Amino acid sequence: MEADLLIYNIKKIYTPLGNCPQCGSDMENIEEIEDAYIAIKDGKILAAGKSPAAISAKEKIDAKGMIAIPGFVDPHTHLIHYGSRENEVALKLKGYCYVDILKQGGGILSTVNATRNASDDQLIEKAMKSLDIMLSHGTTTVEVKSGYGLSTEEEIRLLRLMNKLNSISLVDIVPTFLGAHSIPTEFKENSWGYVDKIINEMIPKVKEENLAEFCDVFCEDGAFDYEQSKKILEEAKKYGMKLKIHADELTQSGGGELAGILGAVSADHLEEVSEKGIELMKKAGTVGVLLPGVSYFLDRPYANARKLIEKGLAVALGTDYNPGTSPTENLQLIMSFAYIKMKMSAKEILTAVTLNAACAIDRGNEIGTIEKGKKADILLIDVPNLDYVMYHFGINHVNTVIKSKGDKAVVIGVR
């Protein structure tokens, strides 16, 4: 066996296995291989296991007793935007809720204005900085939503920029159309008029140019109600798009139930999800993407991860990186929040940010585990054990990132 790259002297590999989301107690099923190696060829994992006596490779990396885990997958971000919203924090400290700020023209709409006024180069430069931060902290694949354009022209522009970013960044980008992020100012008194615009103009144009794999809707009070969300997602499904839903974040909006009924790939947030929503999601195989960074930043209750897992749901974790409710690119910090605030175990968390996160963007057959045939997206982390990643919070534990791009594996030394 000859490899392009051999990583040897690995203290232990921790990885989930398979291509499908791990549900309930199966999230604890982590393969542990001591004194291990990983061989890579043409950007994919050729073999991984107990270190053999000898293996030939063009390039070798001595892991020096570090731990190897799959590259992190962030299944929920709003990467492409301009400006920031630190001015809103003072309002939140005074007791204003997110919906209050949204109704005053703040929140999403203020970022929409800043993004519309930014040039392509400005948006690319800002996004690339964030992608570099993500990669250095171990995120190798990221889902990116539009939603700060809220017009046909601007939404298409943002989706085109995602494709450009995917071609120039080492991080793999999975695009999601989120024209239904908020009602734009020009449709403030005619929300159904905007829904019609999404259905009759935006979705056909997105599909015509093949710009997005997923369609998402913010199903929430102050954004799109249940019937509006249902209509948009049903239309997207007719066009062959896979579905996602911002579900039950601030109120019990029925988003989880809608996700199950329509067979969405994921339902995200779920702080207020109903019992019926959980059952319908479970039957449909919908992944629940939890976003504890939002709960931290908004000082709101966290999603009940333990309940969702014990009910047999597949749970993933994401940053929800955005300028208003979760301004962080650091998935390791999110993992620590899940560990302490949502009572998830280290093994559940690893599954949630690798295989289950990959399945939440329909990439479980390509990434999310360290197995033969998967992309060589691998992290070497300088920690004594898996729990230590979450326990010693607020710092970057990643030493080296191995990132598959095309038919090559690129080695990035973080520190």
Swiss-Prot record:
Q: Which GO terms describe its cellular component?
A: cytoplasm
InterPro entries this protein is in? Amidohydro-rel, HutI, Metal-dep_hydrolase_composite, Metal_Hydrolase
Cell location? Cytoplasm
- Residues the entry annotates as binding Zn(2+): 76, 78, 246, 320
Q: Name one GO molecular function term.
A: iron ion binding
Q: Metal-binding among the record's keywords?
A: yes
| Annotated catalysed reactions | 4-imidazolone-5-propanoate + H2O = N-formimidoyl-L-glutamate
Annotated N-formimidoyl-L-glutamate binding lies at 148, 322, 324
Ligand binding (Fe(3+)): 76, 78, 246, 320
Report keywords, A-Z: Cytoplasm, Histidine metabolism, Hydrolase, Iron, Metal-binding, Zinc
Q: Which GO terms describe its biological process?
A: L-histidine catabolic process to glutamate and formamide; L-histidine catabolic process to glutamate and formate
Q: Which coenzyme or cofactor does it need?
A: Zn(2+); Fe(3+)
- Family annotation (Pfam families): Amidohydro_1 (PF01979)
The protein's Enzyme Commission number: 3.5.2.7
- Family under the similarity heading: Belongs to the metallo-dependent hydrolases superfamily. HutI family.
Which HAMAP family did the record assign? HutI (MF_00372)
What function is annotated for this protein?
Answer: Catalyzes the hydrolytic cleavage of the carbon-nitrogen bond in imidazolone-5-propanoate to yield N-formimidoyl-L-glutamate. It is the third step in the universal histidine degradation pathway.
This protein is called Imidazolonepropionase
Write down the species.
Thermoanaerobacter pseudethanolicus (strain ATCC 33223 / 39E)
